[in-house]
Amino acid sequence: MLRRDFLKYSVALGVASALPLWSRAAFAAERPALPIPDLLTADASNRMQLIVKAGQSTFAGKNATTWGYNGNLLGPAVQLHKGKSVTVDIHNQLAEDTTLHWHGLEIPGIVDGGPQGIIPAGGTRTVTFTPQQRAATCWIHPHKHGKTGRQVAMGLAGLVLIEDDEIRKLRLPKQWGIDDVPVIIQDKRFSADGQIDYQLDIMTAAVGWFGDTLLTNGAIYPQHSAPKGWLRLRLLNGCNARSLNIAASDNRPLYVIASDGGLLAEPVKVTELPLLMGERFEVLVDISDGKAFDLVTLPVSQMGMAIAPFDKPHPVMRIQPLRITASGTLPDTLTTMPALPSLEGLTVRNLKLSMDPRLDMMGMQMLMKKYGAQAMSGMDHDSMNAHMQGGNMGHGEMDHGNMDHSGMNHGAMGNMNHGGKFDFHNANFINGQVFDMNKPMFAAQKGRHERWVISGVGDMMLHPFHIHGTQFRILSENGKAPAAHRTGWKDTVRVEGGISEVLVKFDHDAPKEHAYMAHCHLLEHEDTGMMLGFTV
């Protein structure tokens, strides 16, 4: 053995022995390099092209049909600039209709890309808009009603990077794909022949579609080699239904610098970072010690999501520091957050999220039959028992006093427990109603703050609630003050058996034909009715 090979081998053994057992097991296998999406920028005429297409990808040695934007799987990182208009031609080369939603962007309803913004098979849709919001990491994904879950599962997702003058002045890591790294995390389930195995059925309508394989930027357990110093990770939970809890395998801290809608006032130090479906957080991690480690997701208490291999810490990616050092820094302060306005006299909208108890019961039975007791591991047994006794349709906890009742179908709320043909495609509700594309639930006033009270009381399911056309502030989350890293600009809030309140404002028009959406971002809940439209 040559001396240099011996040294390299010794170093590798040293690195491997420093890692936990579940990580070391895979050390011998050659890991792929973390795929880095290309940056897509507008041309000289402020125009860009996105092509929605089918392709082929390889997972664990088997070829699978996948869908992507401008490629086989996922898509480019679309780069936008605050105050600069852009025109995007979206060409749909799939054999079915789709839409393209700009998740997190504050743009008019007509270009938002919700379920009304259909791009027919073989067709093209052109949108023009001017981002006026602060720098943020957002994303694109399809929003075809009833098909969103499947189209995302097939691979349609990509990042959107909004830049502004303020963030350019900060000395954050900003070398794309080197020390400024996108991390799109998704789980997949594959059939025996290697194809993506998506089903919308009673079980998935209840708990969501989840897989047993974790992909990071479309690759299984990849490695990223980065310069020593500060490493910036732009995290996106792109899963259909799985919440994540991100940590470093050696417990080194993560410094959260931005949430869905942009920079926090100052970095927030955490050792665990819960990440709901559709959420983005930007974190900085110090890798100046030169030691390799894994980014992992820790087990969560969400129903069905602690089934092996997710019953223990699961690697997302390996981070391998290089000998060279990068120049990015972690600033002490990042931006100035505006003070919250007075809540006196604001319009209050009460939204109640619920599930047809027949779907609830049958979905849970199917989950238990397929996976056994492990399906419920980590769950709170008291709330589970109350849930199993039919508690999830109670209405007593709703505050009717100052409620906007205009969109509520009381007949449906009273009757959905009884009789009627059961259709799991229409078995998830907001205020007792399934989504109706032709009937917006209410009209919000442009430029005025509103307080939205979103209740999941009586329902133990996790509902990451997403609102289009705005970046809001969380007033309370499941009855508690928001965690420090969740006090910034957000477009998604956790609703899980409790009540969450957000302060929203809409600065763009959304007419009936292109209403904004508000919905659960567990995609199978959204696809089976837990969504509403509203106008501005």
Curated annotation (Swiss-Prot):
Binds 4 Cu cations per monomer. It is found in: Periplasm. Its EC number is 1.16.3.4. The keyword Oxidoreductase applies. Cu cation 3 binds at H143, H468, H519. Its cofactor is Cu cation. InterPro entries: Cu-oxidase-like_N (IPR011707), Cu-oxidase_C (IPR011706), Cu-oxidase_fam (IPR045087), Cu_oxidase_Cu_BS (IPR002355), Cupredoxin (IPR008972), TAT_signal (IPR006311). Residues 1-28 form the signal peptide. Gene3D superfamilies: Cupredoxins - blue copper proteins. Keywords: Copper, Metal-binding, Oxidoreductase, Periplasm, Repeat, Signal. The keyword Endoplasmic reticulum does not apply. Cu cation 1 binds at H101, H466. PROSITE patterns: MULTICOPPER_OXIDASE2, TAT. GO terms for molecular function: copper ion binding; oxidoreductase activity. Cu cation 2 binds at H103, H141, H521. One of its GO terms (cellular component) is periplasmic space. It catalyses: 4 Cu(+) + O2 + 4 H(+) = 4 Cu(2+) + 2 H2O. Residues 53-165, 229-295, 424-536 form the Plastocyanin-like domain. Belongs to the multicopper oxidase family. Multicopper oxidase involved in copper homeostasis and copper tolerance under aerobic conditions. Is responsible for the oxidation of Cu(+) to the less harmful Cu(2+) in the periplasm, thereby preventing Cu(+) from entering the cytoplasm. Monomer. PANTHER family: BILIRUBIN OXIDASE, CUPREDOXIN SUPERFAMILY PROTEIN. This is Multicopper oxidase CueO. It comes from Salmonella typhi. The gene is cueO.
